Each structure stands twice: as C-alpha cells, then as structure tokens.
Amino acid sequence: MGRTLENKKEIVADLKETLGESTLALVIEYQGLTVAEITDLRKRLRPSGTVCKVTKNTLMGIAIQDDEKWQPLSELLKGSSAFLLVKEDFSSAIKAYQEFQKVTKKTELRGGVMEGRLLKEPDVKALGDLPSKEQLMGQIAGAINALATKIAVGINEVPGGLARALQAVADKENGGDDSAA
C-alpha cells in the first residue's frame, strides 16, 4: 500500500524540521545495505547528533524547495539516497560514516551541503579531518592557559629580577665598603 498524501506531508514537515536544526547534510548511496547495517550506521552517528533519514528523493526535494540554504542538495537527489543530517559535530559524524564505510564498503558518498554550498567528496573528507568541537575547545583552553601561565611567570619575574638587582647593588656597595675599611 502506498503512502497517503497526509503521510507524505508529515514526512516533508519532519524533514524540514530536521534540516532547520542541521548544519550539514550528506547524501550517500545506500543501495545494498541491509536493515541491520542501516541500524548500525544510525547507532554510530547518534553520539555526534546526526540523524540518518532514508526517504524518497522527491520528498526531500519538496522539503528543500523553499529553503535557499539547502537548494544545492537538489543536484545530489538521484538513485537510492540516504541523508545524514548533522546537527552539531560534523567532524565526528563524518569520521563515524568513514569508519562505517571501511567496514561495509557498500555505500558511496555523493556529496553534501553546508551553509548553502555544495560539497564534493574531497570537501567532505577535508571537513572530517578537522578536529572535533571538544578537541578544538581543549586546544583553545590549553593555549589560553599557557598564555596565562607565561604572563604570571613574567609578572612574578619583574619583582624578582628587581630584588636580585637591588641585592647585587647592595652587595657591591657592602663589598666596596669592606675593602675600604
């Protein structure tokens, strides 16, 4: 039995809502994957805040129709498409997909869209090579902490250096007085 018009409208509304929350959309060719493999992919993507949607290209086309941000996605709507809709951590999501691809060797990444720009496979791989959000925050925090430590050491060094200079002058004067007496 086919889908009713009401059911299709619900699917399109759900796609629009998910796209509205997403920063990146990837399109993969999923033909040949079993239900268990799709479930495995979804489990791998879940920690990164990514949703895997398997839907008809025409329904996705209707969902992106009024949103300029996702218009380039229409070029990728052909064949058996699964859509990876990434909400936050795109680097982790891409890495999770790449790990899945290494294991199954059954999917093909067609491309993606981010901020209204069409991404080809090399672009997506470059995004996957970026550090995750947590790693970037750790690197920034480490850099800020190192800078603060250097400033604190520098500030503490000024009075210490001044004290050593004064002590050297005092020792020199005392040493000069001792030889004169």
Curated annotation (Swiss-Prot):
GO biological process assignments: translation
Keyword Calcium: no
Keyword Endoplasmic reticulum: no
UniProt cross-references to Gene3D superfamilies, sorted A to Z: 3.30.70.1730, 6.10.250.290
Subunit structure: Part of the ribosomal stalk of the 50S ribosomal subunit. The N-terminus interacts with L11 and the large rRNA to form the base of the stalk. The C-terminus forms an elongated spine to which L12 dimers bind in a sequential fashion forming a multimeric L10(L12)X complex.
Role played: Forms part of the ribosomal stalk, playing a central role in the interaction of the ribosome with GTP-bound translation factors.
Name of the molecule in the record: Large ribosomal subunit protein uL10
Upper taxonomic lineage: Bacteria, Bacillati, Cyanobacteriota, Cyanophyceae, Nostocales
